Amino acid sequence: MPAATVDHSQRICEVWACNLEEEMKRIRQVTRKFNYIAMDTEFPGVVARPIGEFRSNADYQYQLLRCNVDLLKIIQLGLTFMNEQGEYPPGTSTWQFNFKFNLTEDMYAQDSIELLTSSGIQFKKHEEEGIETMYFAELLMTSGVVLCEGVKWLSFHSGYDFGYLIKILSNSKLPDEEVDFFEILRLFFPIIYDVKYLMKSCKNLKGGLQEVAEQLELERIGPQHQAGSDSLLTGMAFFKMREMFFEDHIDDAKYCGHLYGLGSGSSYVQNGTGNAYEEEANKQQS
């Protein structure tokens, strides 16, 4: 099978509090042979903007991320497992974790919740059957998925995605300074390829995840704007791009560990393409 070709026998496993332990056991087995993990999250938008003086636009973007991740809760996490050739494990390839979220008590941006509701996210079920993030973090820490240099993470414009994961895993607010954020990031996720960052070297590729997938002629499985389907599409995009634009080899020195819109990945500061969070928010719309 060519890398990242759609096979409709692949299925996305829904994970709630009731089946979390069972599915994490399966993941511990899967990750031994399928060590490329494509990741996406769904979160409740942006509700705050930092005030004060900032050293640079890049500093402002990190502080914007930090204040919102600190205030808000993750709604979904999607993890898709693939091997070096872009092949999936037999049966389930993607796990969609649904976290506890209460529309009455938790903060959110109204437009984001409306989009997620229209995409099929069941907020009543999240309130009643959602996963507790602290327990999820305990299981994830011993899963062989994080803190492991043999695992390669694939993402798309993922500053906020990794921000929420770091918040969950460390059970604390994000660090005040971006440099400390990247230090923690490298500890939990030593190898990351952000597809949006890779696109800088791919002629004519542009836009959000869905637009990129269409340009690459990839077929989505599952509903758009849900973390499982988006993580699966992110993994497909990485392997298709690696084949088409990188001769099946990614230069780690140039691309590994960079997140689009943050740190050295903040090319928008120089080229004037605007606010990185607005692009991140638009990623959910596209």
Curated annotation (Swiss-Prot):
It is an enzyme of class 3 (hydrolase). One of its GO terms (cellular component) is CCR4-NOT complex. Its EC number is 3.1.13.4. A divalent metal cation 1 binds at residues 40, 161, 278. Keywords: Cytoplasm, Exonuclease, Hydrolase, Magnesium, Metal-binding, Nuclease, Nucleus, Repressor, RNA-binding, RNA-mediated gene silencing, Transcription, Transcription regulation, Translation regulation. Its cofactor is Mn(2+); Mg(2+); Co(2+). This is CCR4-NOT transcription complex subunit 7. Has 3'-5' poly(A) exoribonuclease activity for synthetic poly(A) RNA substrate. Catalytic component of the CCR4-NOT complex which is one of the major cellular mRNA deadenylases and is linked to various cellular processes including bulk mRNA degradation, miRNA-mediated repression, translational repression during translational initiation and general transcription regulation. During miRNA-mediated repression the complex also seems to act as translational repressor during translational initiation. Additional complex functions may be a consequence of its influence on mRNA expression. The keyword Hydrolase applies. Belongs to the CAF1 family. A divalent metal cation 2 binds at residues 40, 42, 230. One of its GO terms (biological process) is miRNA-mediated gene silencing by mRNA destabilization. It comes from the Eukaryota. It is found in: Nucleus; Cytoplasm. It holds the Pfam family CAF1. It catalyses: Exonucleolytic cleavage of poly(A) to 5'-AMP. Binds 2 divalent metal cations per subunit with RNAase activity being higher in presence of Mn(2+) than of Mg(2+) or Co(2+). GO terms for molecular function: 3'-5'-RNA exonuclease activity; metal ion binding; poly(A)-specific ribonuclease activity; RNA binding; RNA exonuclease activity. Component of the CCR4-NOT complex. Its main location: nucleus.
